[in-house]
From Swiss-Prot:
Belongs to the iron-sulfur cluster assembly SufBD family. Was identified as a high-confidence drug target. Transmembrane segments: none annotated. It comes from Mycobacterium tuberculosis (strain ATCC 25618 / H37Rv). InterPro entries: Fe-S_cluster_assembly_SufBD, SUF_FeS_clus_asmbl_SufBD_core, SUF_FeS_clus_asmbl_SufBD_sf, SUF_FeS_clus_asmbl_SufD. One of its GO terms (biological process) is iron-sulfur cluster assembly. Pfam families: SUFBD_core. This is Iron-sulfur cluster assembly SufBD family protein Rv1462. Keywords: Acetylation. The modification N-acetylthreonine is found at T2. It comes from the Bacteria. SUPFAM superfamilies: Stabilizer of iron transporter SufD.
Length: 397
């Protein structure tokens, strides 16, 4: 059943991508099947029942928030009227998460407050063999500004909704990191509401976990909004990492830029499934969204055999009175010419490969506003490349 006080949050929302159905009620959704468009890439059998109602909560995730001046953290129940202002679940798992969480964490930056230090939010999973559901809302009030780092650790089976409410003329940089243990299944639905002249920088990083699927809906609720969505992912043998985005331009003179990059490395000799990444990027420009300027890009670098990348950009335009709109997608292996150039200058092949991958991800890492996160990602990529080299040596021997 829909929680009291949330009906108003549902009313008036223009459901995006062909008026996609949305509800807080899990029973309003059918159980997903592989033929469903939004689930056709997702390995449903590996979701441990998150999609069909059989995954009952047996544990809980722990959420801790660092203390900062002007930042308030609250724990609230499902009936709190603020919940759902960022958006409404558009799939069964997100609705299941909303129907099943025990308490929600609200992090609020006060009006006209500029938070100097990043706000750290650590989410620790319920543990191996346990299932949990969660809800997090980050709210930046009018003229406020903050950087928030949401860091996922530990393991287990977890589904949640994450809301980003950015009020008029506010600015939020949100860095979402999935650095789970190898046994983790995590499905996360993000809902962003961007006010008039507000700015959202949304960065997702996927490194760990068995199956990690992040779906993000970004909704402009006033003119002059600006959204930048960045993503970095690195899939190993057996991993499924999936990103699904929808940017809904419903007001004039808004901008959006999407840039996601991923690398994959598998092991054809392994009994595990192939490394698999999925990126689906939807941009909707409504008839009233004149003056829109938008572009989206997805690039994938396949490092070994036993890896597969699916990339699906979509652009729907209902008005011709825009500044610009476009998309690009490419998946390929190492550029042989780049490798040849580097090796011809005496650089060993392994080091040359590292340089190419560093350059591939460097554009995104440089855009992340938190030095500690940049350093961490650089180290993580180096570690992944060590795995690549180890796999290649084993294959050769």
């Amino acid at each position: 059943m829909t929680a009291p006080g949330l009906t108003a949050a549902v009313e008036g929302i223009a459901h995006n991508k062909g008026e996609l159905f949305a509800s807080f009620d899990v029973d309003a959704f059918e159980v997903p099947h592989g033929r469903d468009e939004i689930w056709r890439f997702t390995p449903l059998r590996r979701l441990r029942g998150l999609h069909d109602g059989s995954a009952r909560a047996t544990g809980s995730a722990t959420i801790t928030v660092s203390e900062r001046p002007g930042v308030y953290t609250q724990t609230v129940r499902r009936g709190d009227p603020r919940l759902g202002e960022g958006g409404v679940p558009t799939d069964r798992v997100a609705a299941q998460a909303f129907s099943s969480f025990n308490s929600a964490t609200l992090v609020t930056v006060e009006r006209d407050t500029q938070v100097v230090e990043p706000v750290g939010i650590t989410v620790t999973g319920p543990g191996e063999g346990a299932v949990a559901y969660g809800h997090l809302q980050v709210r930046i009030e009018e003229l406020g500004e903050a950087v928030v780092v949401i860091d996922h650790r530990g393991g287990g089976t977890y589904a949640d909704n994450v809301e980003f409410v950015v009020d008029d003329a506010a600015r939020l940089t949100a860095v979402w990191i999935a650095d789970w243990a190898d046994n983790t299944v995590h499905l996360s639905a993000h809902h962003a509401r961007i006010g008039k002249d507000a700015v959202l920088r949304h960065v997702t990083v996927m490194l760990g976990g068995d199956v990690v699927r992040m779906s993000a809906g970004v909704r402009f609720c006033g003119a002059g909004g600006d959204a930048e969505l960045l993503g970095l992912y690195f899939a190993d043998d057996g991993q499924h990492l999936e990103s699904r985005l929808l940017v809904d331009h419903a007001h004039p003179d808004c901008k959006s830029n999407v840039l996601y990059k991923g690398a994959l490395q598998g092991d054809p000799a392994s009994s595990l499934p192939d490394a698999h990444t999925v990126w689906v990027g939807d941009v909707l420009i409504r008839a009233q969204a004149t003056g829109t300027d938008t572009f989206e890009v997805n690039r994938n670098l396949v490092l070994t055999d036993g890896a597969r990348a699916d990339s699906v950009p979509n652009l729907e335009i209902e008005t011709g009175e825009i500044v610009g709109a476009g998309h690009a997608s490419a998946t390929g292996r190492f550029d042989d010419e780049q490798l040849f150039y580097l090796r011809s200058r005496g650089i060993p092949e392994a080091q040359a490969r590292r340089l190419v991958v560093r350059g591939f991800f460097g554009e995104i890492i440089a855009k992340i506003a938190v030095p500690e996160v940049r350093e961490r990602l650089t180290a993580a990529i180096e570690h992944e490349l060590e795995i690549t080299e180890s796999t290649e040596k084993t294959t050769v021997s």
